Design a protein with these regions (language model features):
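N-terminal redox-cofactor-binding region of secreted/periplasmic oxidoreductases
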Residues: 2-617
Length: 617
């Protein structure tokens, strides 16, 4: 990779960043000093908050305040391939979970780092942009858990309103000019048909067609080569409305109640200015699955013993606030290939890639590095098409110890290495974690314990995904590109399977035999020392379990901490109080099968309608 390419990359990125920052604050809705009273106060300008602020402010007679803790997002958040570059910066809460008991042994202090967006657009601005509506059974499960009115059939009108489709595979560019999808705010981009890794993955899946197997090509929230999430589709077009105020760099502290009716919101601006903003109608919490339960508990809504122990005034006892946390875990399985069809660092930083992106809105940078996903029962495999990656960036983001990272990603220093990763996951994990307070001060970090792999079901489910990956790689489409799986060798797992040692036994015996027989000929030396490609057998389940407990990491989908049916009712109203609703992923009673972001957009559309139709008392 030439110095010229690097220089051009840095220069273009720098200029783009300056331009983005210069014009980010031209909208009149951004304010620094709020008025004392609003009709609606929305906490959190994430995926749901952007939709709600846009829809509720459509009525010019109401005043809406959107409170966001973060500041404007940087330019890199707009480039689909560089989404992770925004993580662990000023626009990421970078939640550090508690040391895990059953997983994360390959991470420093067994501590997962969970990215959470901080700024307009929230996590939708730093995620991998992947679109999907889950599976119909996901919503039926919600109903069985007591969250009524949110089935797939209930949400279809809102998915159509937001996306113009109810399909998980879709391209907005194919919309007729007068079609429903052309009018929809959200835009989708389907991976190109000529993407070879996607085609190979799809062919292999078809070759091993089995019951309850579903393949989906990658679809992303992308428009004209740029990230296009709810901030772009909903909030940005509304930012010149006089009745909409957006307050950045402002943290919501707690809600004040009078006779169990929400009357105001305490806020902290720039970490120093405390203020109290009054509300006429409702406060809607859209702060995410960590911050929303934190605000509730600081407001006196949550487990009685915890609230009392922190000397917070108890408003209502609800043991479910902060419980039921669920997340997907991903186990990365590196596969090397011999055909140059994956995304590598050398390709990403080439001059041609930069020209493709900045002049044509196309190329490697214009789409997230995911080819597709295959579901089989409760397991799934995602094909992540990066053959090489930055060790420093990924290791810092995941919190891997250096040795573990280098063993898991063996070609981290080869910028031209061709390959990909299968991410093995369980789409309906049963392990449940918690979010709780350590102190009544917001300056003290909240305690987040995902409790990953606590349930044996999750282990068995992920093992099935790994076995599926093994079988897929034996199919002709993958064999033709020389696909070869790499099994890491973490020290903790060698007890269960030390394949390298077994493969080398024969070579060691031959060398010892030659030593006793005198000096070998040159030809004999060549025959002995010439490495042979080991035939690695399939590892035992015990090794796979050890491996996932060592290197599996968050899927970035934490949810469920204010579960529907437990903390909120079917109208998203917080139980036993009035004037407070919740609309974010914290209301999910159980996981959505993989990507939740598009689901949240549709749910927020319905939530806005529910709020608008609520009679004013």
């Amino acid at each position: 990779m030439s110095i010229f390419s690097y220089t051009i990359s840095i220069l273009v990125a720098f200029v783009s960043y300056i331009v983005y920052q210069k014009y980010a604050n031209v909208y009149t809705s951004f304010i620094t000093k709020p008025v004392k009273r609003y009709d609606y106060i929305i906490v959190g300008a994430g995926t749901a908050g952007c939709v709600l602020a846009s829809r509720l402010s459509e009525d010019p007679k109401v005043k809406v305040l959107l409170v966001e803790a973060g500041d404007h997002m940087g330019y890199f958040s707009k480039v689909p391939l560089t989404s992770t570059a925004s993580q662990q910066g000023s626009n990421d809460w970078s939640v550090r979970a508690t040391p895990q008991k059953y997983s994360s042994f390959g991470l420093w202090n067994q501590t997962p780092i969970i990215p959470r967006g901080k700024g307009p657009g929230g996590s939708g601005q730093i995620n991998f942009l992947l679109h999907g509506f889950g599976l119909p059974e996901d919503y039926n499960r919600w109903s069985r858990l007591g969250f009524k009115g949110w089935t797939m059939d209930d949400l279809k009108p809102y998915f159509l309103k937001a996306f113009g489709t109810v399909r998980s595979e879709f391209d907005s560019d194919s919309c007729p000019a007068k079609g429903v999808c052309a009018k929809a705010p959200m835009k989708l981009k389907l991976i190109h048909e000529d993407n070879e890794l996607m085609s190979i993955f799809k062919q292999a899946s078809s070759a091993l067609a089995a019951k309850n197997t579903l393949f989906r090509k990658a679809t992303a929230n992308v428009k004209d080569g740029s990230r296009y999430q709810s901030y772009d589709a909903y909030l940005k077009p509304a930012l010149k409305r006089k009745n909409l105020h957006v307050l950045l760099k402002t943290q919501a502290i707690s809600i004040r109640f009078e006779e169990e009716k929400a009357t105001s919101l305490y806020i902290l601006q720039d970490h120093r200015n405390l203020d109290n903003i009054f509300v006429n109608r409702e406060i809607i919490l859209s702060a995410g699955s960590v911050k929303t339960p934190q605000i509730l508990m600081l407001s006196g809504i949550g487990p009685r013993n915890l609230i009392k122990s922190l000397q917070i005034n108890l408003i209502t006892d609800n043991e479910w606030v902060g419980r039921n946390l669920h997340d997907h875990m991903n186990l990365p399985i590196y596969v090397s290939i011999k055909k140059p069809i994956s995304v590598t660092l050398a390709k990403v930083f080439s001059a041609s890639t930069l020209v493709d992106y900045f002049w044509n809105n196309s190329g490697y940078l214009a789409f997230p590095p995911v080819a597709g996903v295959e579901y089989q029962n409760a397991s799934a495999l995602m094909l992540f098409s990066m053959g090489s990656s930055s060790e420093r960036l990924l290791r810092d983001l995941s919190n891997y110890r250096p040795k573990v990272f280098r063993d898991t990603f063996p070609f981290h220093n080869d910028t031209s290495k061709e390959g990909f990763m299968f991410l093995a996951t369980c789409i309906q994990p049963k392990s449940r974690g918690t979010v709780t307070l350590r102190d009544s001060s917001t300056s003290v970090p909240i305690v987040v314990d995902p409790n990953y792999l606590n349930r044996e079901y999750d282990v068995k489910c992920m093992i099935k995904a790994i076995r599926r990956a093994e079988r897929l790689l034996t199919t002709k489409p993958f064999e033709e590109i020389g696909a070869r799986i790499h099994w890491p060798r973490p020290e903790r797992c060698l007890t269960f399977w030390n394949y390298t040692k077994l493969d080398q036994k024969g070579l060691v015996r031959r060398r010892k035999k030659m030593k006793t027989q005198g000096a070998p000929s040159v030809q004999a030396q060549k025959e002995v020392t010439k490495p042979t490609k080991p035939k690695i057998q399939s590892p035992p389940n015990e090794y796979l379990e050890c491996l996932m407990r060592e290197v599996a990491v968050t899927g970035h989908h934490i949810a469920g901490t204010c579960a529907g049916g437990k903390v909120v009712d079917s109208q998203l109203r917080v139980k036993n109080v009035s004037g407070v609703r919740i609309m974010d992923a914290s209301v999910f009673p159980a996981p959505i099968s993989l990507y939740p972001n598009s689901v949240i957009v549709g749910m927020a559309e319905k939530a806005a309608e529910l709020i608008k139709n609520t009679p004013r008392l």
